[in-house]
Structures are given as C-alpha cells and as structure tokens.
Regions:
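Active-site core segments that coordinate phosphate-bearing ligands/cofactors
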Residues: 1-264, 268
Length: 274
C-alpha cells in the first residue's frame, strides 16, 4: 500500500488511489471513483460522524455547566482537548463513534448503529471520556482502511481536526503509519480543479499535476509513537469484536424506538378535514 488520505471533519473520509485491478470491496460499503489517469481509481470508505462525536461530548459538558450557572465558551472547551488527552491514559475505554442518528456507513452499513462507551469505571473522569472519543476516530480510520484490504504506508490528513497534534499522533498510531498534513485549504475543491486541469491538457498527466499542486504543500512526516502504536494494535481487535457483538443490541433498541414512535403516532392522530 502507498499513501492514503483522510479528511477528519464533521464526517470522516478515508481514500486511497489504486489500480482498478486492485480494488478490494467489503460487502456493500464504500465507493469507487474514476480518476483521469490510466486504470486508476479512488477507493473510499466514509464514517457518518467523525468530529461530530467530539462536538457531542463537549456540548454535553457545556449544557451541564450552563444549567449550573457557569456558561462556558465552546471554543474554550475545544482548546482544552489536547490538555485532557495529555492527562489521560491511552486505551482504557472503548468508544464506537456512531453518534449520527443515521447510523454508520463505513466500513459497516447499519442504520441502527449507535455510539457507546465500553469499559467505564468509577475512576474515570471527563478527560478519559474525551480520550476515548478521540481514539475512536483512529479506530474508525483503521477500520475503514482495513476494509480496503491494506493499511497505508503514509497517511495524509486534511480537515479541521488535523490541526491538533495530539489527534494526529493518535491517527498515526492507530493506522501504524506516519502522517503528513496538507497546508492546502479546501482540498476537495483543489482535487476537482486538478482533474479538470489534466482533462483539458494543462498537465500531461496526474503525476505532474500532483508534483506541483500537492507535494510542495505537505508538511513533514510525523511518525507514530511506538508504545502508542502497540497499544492501539492490541486494542483494535476488541474494538472490532465489540462492534460485531453490539449489532443485535442496536437492532433491539431500534425496534423499541420504532414501537414507541408508533404508539405516539397512534395516540396523536393527525387532525384534518374530510
């Protein structure tokens, strides 16, 4: 496997460029996008929610503080994340980042999937929960690249969350590869422009376009911390097994929600004229 690219924003998008003969599909998840390069495609797996999980946790804290008469600025809570990560131990709690009400779409497709913590004890505090949520983004990235058959040898990052050095370290350790951050803003729009530039002949091929548009804007490689990488390699199988074991639980909860909604609809029929 070569370099791959992940965009860690509200959602998570994980991509690798491969020859069309090397496409590896898992079930009904993922996408394949044609590229303006001979026999090359982009294979993609996406998470319904990435930093939305962090937003949820921080807004829970902000709501609680507001109710007790201590309103807090959300941006200030975001600025505290790296400090909370530094004060907590890696790999103590599992969290599946399925906070979207639409469930998950990569690498599993399950509208009933829901987020949850595993491994809580009375000794855990808010920084431990934040760490578990942030670590889940690394686990989700590893999950998605595993579904594409190979983990990358280098991971290139875009998206707002890539500004956090602590998060970059977690992602590097989770996928077991150095990470590099692109300084280019709006990378998706730039990619569209690059494809158009090749299509109209402004560049002879995609490689020459990449050499000018992408490579000069990449930051230095940040290698994974060995102990953290070992921790996540040990933790990932438990993350995957727990996800599989939870599927019937999600289904039962969804059936309960649907039943409750049906009762509400029956007790509050729509009023209308005949």
């Amino acid at each position: 496997a070569g370099a791959a690219c992940s965009t860690i924003g509200s959602t998570g998008v994980h991509m690798r460029a491969v020859k069309d003969s090397d496409i590896k599909l898992r079930g009904n998840s993922g996408y394949v996008i044609c590229l303006p390069a001979d026999h090359m495609v982009t294979q993609v797996q996406t998470n319904m929610a990435a930093t939305l999980n962090i937003d949820w946790a921080l807004r829970m804290a902000a709501d609680l503080m507001s109710e007790t008469g201590h309103p807090h600025d959300y941006a200030d809570l975001v600025a505290r994340i790296d400090g909370w990560l530094a004060r907590s131990e890696p790999g103590q709690i599992l969290y599946h980042p399925y906070i979207s009400e639409a469930g998950e779409r990569g690498p599993i497709v399950n509208a009933n999937a829901r987020a949850g913590f595993i491994g809580l004890s009375s000794g855990h505090r808010f920084p431990d929960l934040i760490r578990a949520v942030v670590e889940s983004l690394g686990m989700a990235a590893r999950d998605c690249y595993g579904a594409m058959d190979e983990l990358p040898k280098e991971l290139r990052l875009t998206g707002g969350a890539a500004r956090s050095r602590a998060l970059r370290g977690i992602l590097a350790a989770a996928v077991g590869a150095p990470v590099r951050v692109s300084a280019r803003e709006e990378a998706g729009a730039a990619g569209c422009a690059m494809m158009a530039a090749v299509a109209i002949g402004a560049y002879s091929d995609m490689e020459s376009c990449v050499s000018e548009w992408v490579t000069p804007l990449l930051g230095d490689a940040e290698t994974p911390e060995p102990d953290l990488q070992a921790t996540y390699s040990e933790l990932y199988p438990a993350y995957a097994k727990a996800r599989e074991a939870l599927e019937p639980v999600w289904d039962r909860l969804a059936a309960h929600r649907d039943g409750a909604d049906a009762k509400d609809d029956a007790s509050n029929p729509t009023q209308g004229g005949s």
